[in-house]
């Protein structure tokens, strides 16, 4: 079985793929100092809760936090005797080549999203990923990643507002019943929710106009279902797109190097 690890700035997700479907998905907060032993304790405890004892044959990692990769490598080596495939490293081949400015690095999560989107839907699409940042990733007709947009994430915006404005509280994001708020919390929720609806609509409209061809819009990330409620922002929402992209990248590398 394949263990897929997606480490972002806020959360780290472990998912186990049996070749056809996900056995389980586990999420924890990202900590730079978390040790390999701590990862194993957390991982094995949750596996016991799920009542499964999978045979992990391979591991693939996508991480936007370089400092965490070392401890994840130690975790894989110590407890599975495996050398993980790390997206973005020279020994990890991609089924497509990014067409971006020379010397520009592309986040491994964005590459995985592009690969997953192309595998499921073909090209000419834009992936909107709600993470610490809100990313818009454009996938060309041939599957190449050709660029995108990075905007502040929803929760990051809420935190910045609470930190920067002494009189404003930190609130949780939800879809307001109305645009006009009648109390401070409702006003903040309305501003952030409807502000991001406008952001998504505006940026995807401009991307489509600049691209010059019809495009599918795919939502992913933890908050995508919230923003899809009653709004025509996405053609589809897929909460496992990044992880699915990792399975495609892993298979591509195994097919290239079957040994």
UniProtKB/Swiss-Prot annotation:
GO (cellular component) term, any one: cytoplasm
Compartments, record wording: Cytoplasm
Annotated positions binding ATP: 6-13, 132
Cofactor info, note text: A monovalent cation. Ammonium or potassium.
Catalytic activity: (R)-pantothenate + ATP = (R)-4'-phosphopantothenate + ADP + H(+)
Pfam families found in the cross-reference section: Pan_kinase
GO process annotations (BP): coenzyme A biosynthetic process
Domain of life (superkingdom): Bacteria
Residues noted as binding substrate in the record, renumbered to the chain: 107-110, 184
Keyword Transmembrane helix: no
Pathway in which the depicted protein is active: Cofactor biosynthesis; coenzyme A biosynthesis; CoA from (R)-pantothenate: step 1/5
Active site: 109 (proton acceptor)
GO MF entries: ATP binding; metal ion binding; pantothenate kinase activity
Top-level EC class as recorded in UniProt: transferase
Residues reported in the UniProt entry to bind K(+): 129
Main location: cytoplasm
Keyword vocabulary terms for this entry: ATP-binding, Coenzyme A biosynthesis, Cytoplasm, Kinase, Metal-binding, Nucleotide-binding, Potassium, Transferase
Known cofactor(s): NH4(+); K(+)
EC number, as in UniProt: 2.7.1.33
SUPFAM superfamilies in UniProt: Actin-like ATPase domain (SSF53067)
Record's function text: Catalyzes the phosphorylation of pantothenate (Pan), the first step in CoA biosynthesis.
Family (UniProt): Belongs to the type III pantothenate kinase family.
Stored NCBIfam families: baf (TIGR00671), PRK13318.1-2 (NF009844), PRK13321.1 (NF009855)
Subunit structure: Homodimer.
Name used for this protein in its record: Type III pantothenate kinase
Organism: Jannaschia sp. (strain CCS1)
Lineage of origin: Bacteria, Pseudomonadati, Pseudomonadota, Alphaproteobacteria, Rhodobacterales
Encoding gene (name): coaX
